[in-house]
């Protein structure tokens, strides 16, 4: 299988190195990643600016752009053979609930899904400094080898692995997205007149406790796998909204 590996933590991150080290033993891996940290960039693309792309060797490229840029160049830049699977991660920190709308990790995988590739985003709850993520990568390899034939194109499979996990498929749970809440704080530095610099000082993160969600699985020590559709239409409201507007216009 031809696997494009990318992330939003940058080319030097331990998570992407672990995926490549483990997967290249049995698959053809092609690594293309941002030059620097690009967290919370979702599916941003560089459409007005050129991007500097550096070829390290035949299968390694660095892009001065966003994670979705990396996927786009990997798929359409005539540098790799046809890619079967877009694999994004392993992210240092989880992406669950509403996180998925901001995440560059998930955004990169979603871009693969837009272009009809199998797409998997992987995040870890282990944010220990200098951790190597090899155990997580081995689990991902096992999952791909066992189940990739059952996955569908046009779907993003979002996997979150707890800090202390049992590396067994019996520990995997298929989940839905939970509800994340954010309480953001900013610091401000006044420059001159009405000009000021704002810095996101941090976010207090909470989540709802509900059965069947990624949060519930994760915090009970299970590995969550959530299938994410590209179609974000709220089907339940389509007819209701149509009927409501029709009545108001009649």
Curated annotation (Swiss-Prot):
Its main location: cytoplasm. The keyword Cytoplasm applies. The keyword Metal-binding applies. It is found in: Cytoplasm. Keywords: Cytoplasm, Hydrolase, Metal-binding, Nucleotide-binding. It comes from the Bacteria. It catalyses: a ribonucleoside 5'-phosphate + H2O = a ribonucleoside + phosphate. A divalent metal cation binds at residues 8-9, 39, 91. GO terms for molecular function: 3'-nucleotidase activity; 5'-nucleotidase activity; exopolyphosphatase activity; metal ion binding; nucleotide binding. One of its GO terms (cellular component) is cytoplasm. Its cofactor is a divalent metal cation. Binds 1 divalent metal cation per subunit. InterPro entries: SurE, SurE-like_Pase/nucleotidase, SurE-like_sf. It is an enzyme of class 3 (hydrolase). Its EC number is 3.1.3.5. PANTHER family: 5'-NUCLEOTIDASE SURE, 5'_3'-NUCLEOTIDASE SURE. Nucleotidase that shows phosphatase activity on nucleoside 5'-monophosphates. Belongs to the SurE nucleotidase family. This is 5'-nucleotidase SurE. It comes from Leptospira borgpetersenii serovar Hardjo-bovis (strain JB197). The lineage of its organism: Bacteria, Pseudomonadati, Spirochaetota, Spirochaetia, Leptospirales. The gene is surE.
């Amino acid at each position: 299988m031809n696997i494009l590996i990318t992330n939003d933590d940058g080319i030097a991150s331990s998570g992407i190195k672990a995926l490549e080290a483990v997967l290249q033993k049995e698959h053809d891996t092609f690594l293309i990643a941002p030059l620097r940290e690009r967290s919370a960039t979702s599916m941003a693309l560089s459409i007005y600016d050129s991007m500097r792309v550096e070829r390290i060797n035949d299968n390694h490229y660095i892009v001065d752009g966003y994670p979705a840029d990396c996927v786009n160049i990997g798929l359409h830049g005539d540098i790799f053979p046809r890619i079967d699977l877009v694999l994004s991660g392993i992210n240092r920190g989880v992406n669950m609930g509403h996180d998925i709308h901001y995440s560059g990790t998930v955004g990169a995988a979603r871009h693969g899904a837009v272009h009809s590739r199998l797409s998997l985003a992987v995040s870890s709850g282990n944010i220990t400094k200098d951790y190597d993520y090899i155990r997580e990568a081995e689990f991902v390899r096992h999952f791909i080898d066992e189940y990739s034939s059952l996955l569908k194109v046009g779907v993003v499979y979002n996997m979150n692995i707890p800090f202390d996990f049992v590396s067994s498929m019996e520990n995997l749970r298929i989940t839905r997205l939970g509800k994340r809440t954010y309480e953001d704080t900013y610091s401000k530095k006044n420059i001159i007149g009405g000009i000021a610099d704002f810095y996101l000082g941090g976010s207090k993160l909470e989540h709802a406790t509900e059965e069947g969600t990624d949060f519930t699985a994760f915090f009970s020590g299970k590995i969550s796998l959530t299938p994410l559709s590209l179609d974000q239409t709220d089907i339940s409201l389509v007819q209701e909204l149509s009927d409501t507007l029709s009545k108001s216009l009649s």
